[in-house]
């Protein structure tokens, strides 16, 4: 059954992916008179570019083909952003048909500018997002307890040592009491990213680093994540809770992707079974789902990631339609959920209308 689901997903994703290519091609040729030679050239570019992403994905574990993988991700981002711009161009052309040709040329220029901006955006280090969250059950002497929330780092063989070193430096400057990571830490096999655990061991917090799995940990093999975490001095929470500084509980559940690999999925009831007192409970859950149920079980704060805040067009527009708590801080009764845009990137090395972030959370006794 998992194999059948995978084949179905690949077929649907492939159809959508190449459909985007055809749409852009169609949008151009129906608006501008082009010679047969130019049309053929565009078709060849679309086919080769489209195949570069799939070829890179299938061959991503092979060394020496990094250029193909990276180029494929760049192409994926270019197509996604361009599709969005051309789609809105075609809607506008319905009302302004006499300007269709001009709008098409303008769309080409806007696409180039947007793609360039998206690439330049990720050259910047993650921004620091500082928030304060009221915590009614937190002892007054613990007010100001500082948590650094990271998520979706997606460490792979494209990740640079300099980027990790900068991340560690920026986190340590915040002098956190606790570092919490909500999944998708790695996106590769351990033997291809083994230089990073020694760098991540330099993360400093008074009460350690705790982490849960994301969906990508299962795609590459959960054992790589577990070994990577152990080497990095990360404590993995798998349907379990830990008491921190005798003032709050941190509960971690695995991503629901675990069930697709015949592994135990998230079980919040089991994870909270041994919590008997009235101290605040912080839940680590990769996807920003299940928050109302978590509140009913006594969770004070849920930390999540996964959405990347869309990362690029058109996902920026679609993610809020898919996830109710897609980005930022939300309140329900006296509990909160914070969904981060992510510390790193997945796929295209681009961001537009969103930034990578390090989240610094001060818990305020109330």
PLM feature spans:
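N-terminal signal-anchor transmembrane helix
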Residues: 65-71, 93-150, 156-169, 173
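Non-catalytic terminal accessory segments
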Residues: 1-124
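Soluble catalytic domains of enzymes that build or remodel membrane lipids, polysaccharides, and related
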Residues: 138-366
């Amino acid at each position: 059954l998992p194999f059948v689901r995978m084949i179905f997903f690949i077929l649907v994703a492939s159809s959508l992916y190449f459909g985007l290519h055809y749409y852009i091609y169609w949008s151009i040729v129906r608006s501008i008179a082009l010679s047969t030679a130019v049309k053929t050239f565009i078709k060849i570019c679309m086919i080769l570019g489209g195949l570069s992403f799939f070829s890179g994905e299938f061959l991503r574990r092979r060394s020496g083909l990094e250029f193909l993988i990276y180029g494929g991700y760049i192409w994926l981002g270019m197509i996604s952003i361009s599709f969005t711009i051309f789609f809105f161009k075609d809607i506008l052309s319905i009302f302004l048909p006499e300007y269709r040709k001009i709008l098409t040329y303008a769309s080409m220029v806007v696409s180039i500018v947007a793609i360039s901006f998206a690439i330049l955006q990720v050259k910047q280090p993650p921004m620091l997002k500082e928030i304060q969250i009221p915590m009614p059950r937190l002892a007054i002497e613990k007010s100001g307890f500082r948590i650094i929330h990271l998520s979706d780092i997606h460490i792979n063989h494209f990740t640079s040592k300099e980027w990790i070193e900068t991340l560690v430096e920026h986190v340590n400057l915040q002098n956190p009491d606790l570092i919490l990571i909500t999944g998708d830490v790695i996106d590769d096999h351990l033997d291809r990213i083994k230089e990073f655990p020694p760098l991540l061991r330099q993360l400093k917090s008074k009460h350690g680093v705790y982490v849960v799995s994301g969906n990508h940990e299962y795609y590459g093999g959960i054992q790589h994540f577990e070994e990577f975490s152990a080497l990095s001095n990360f404590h993995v929470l798998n349907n379990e809770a830990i008491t921190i500084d005798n003032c709050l509980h941190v509960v971690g559940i695995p991503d629901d992707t675990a069930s697709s690999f015949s592994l135990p999925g998230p079980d919040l009831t089991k994870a909270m079974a041994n919590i008997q007192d009235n101290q605040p409970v912080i839940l680590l859950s990769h996807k920003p789902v299940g928050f109302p149920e978590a509140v009913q079980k006594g969770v004070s704060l849920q930390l999540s990631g996964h959405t990347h805040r869309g990362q690029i067009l058109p996902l920026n527009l679609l993610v809020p339609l898919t996830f109710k708590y897609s980005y930022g801080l939300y309140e329900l009764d006296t509990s909160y959920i914070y969904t981060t845009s992510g510390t790193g990137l997945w796929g295209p090395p681009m961001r537009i209308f969103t930034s990578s972030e390090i989240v610094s959370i001060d818990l305020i006794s109330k």
